[in-house]
């Protein structure tokens, strides 16, 4: 009798494993897909002006109690990501006071492809 049930059990076990794996993947990717982070972009508005050091910006914003998700250079700008819109707005206000004239600081609208890649990224983002 066990010989008769063996093919049925293996197919059933396989189906259960596929369903469990699918459920696990769904649970893993749902938070990543619906993550809503905001970003600021700092650009030099004049030729010859160098961007501020990312670590300096991190230290100053951290001293103000603003939590930063990541700071990365992007072409000729510095992109700072935050978990919430409130953190981003507070950081923009602090950066306007902190950085001298000659820098454009503003909210960054993520493009469709980079936003999708950001949402699909499973790597933990870090500062630095």
Curated annotation (Swiss-Prot):
Record-level Gene Ontology MF annotations: protein kinase binding
UniProt entry keywords in alphabetical sequence: Cell inner membrane, Cell membrane, Membrane, Transmembrane, Transmembrane helix
Places the protein is found: Cell inner membrane
Periplasmic domain ranges by topology: 35-128
Membrane topology: Single-pass membrane protein
Keyword Cytoplasm: no
GO cellular component, one term: plasma membrane
Ranges annotated as spanning the membrane: 14-34
Cytoplasmic face residues: 1-13
Family the UniProt entry places it in: Belongs to the MzrA family.
Functional note: Modulates the activity of the EnvZ/OmpR two-component regulatory system, probably by directly modulating EnvZ enzymatic activity and increasing stability of phosphorylated OmpR.
Subunit structure: Interacts with EnvZ.
Protein name: Modulator protein MzrA
Gene of this entry: mzrA
């Amino acid at each position: 009798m066990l010989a008769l049930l063996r093919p049925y059990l293996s197919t059933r076990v396989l189906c259960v494993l596929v369903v469990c794996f699918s459920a696990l993947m769904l649970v893993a990717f749902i938070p990543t897909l619906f993550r809503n982070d905001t970003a600021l972009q700092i650009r030099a508005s004049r030729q010859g002006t160098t961007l501020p050091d990312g670590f300096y910006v991190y230290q100053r914003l951290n001293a103000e109690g603003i939590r930063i998700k990541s700071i990365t250079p992007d072409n000729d700008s510095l992109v700072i990501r935050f978990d919430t819109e409130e953190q981003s707005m507070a950081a923009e206000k602090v950066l306007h006071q902190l950085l001298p004239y000659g820098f454009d600081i503003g909210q960054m609208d993520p493009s469709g492809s980079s936003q999708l890649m950001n949402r699909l990224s499973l790597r933990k983002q870090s500062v630095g």
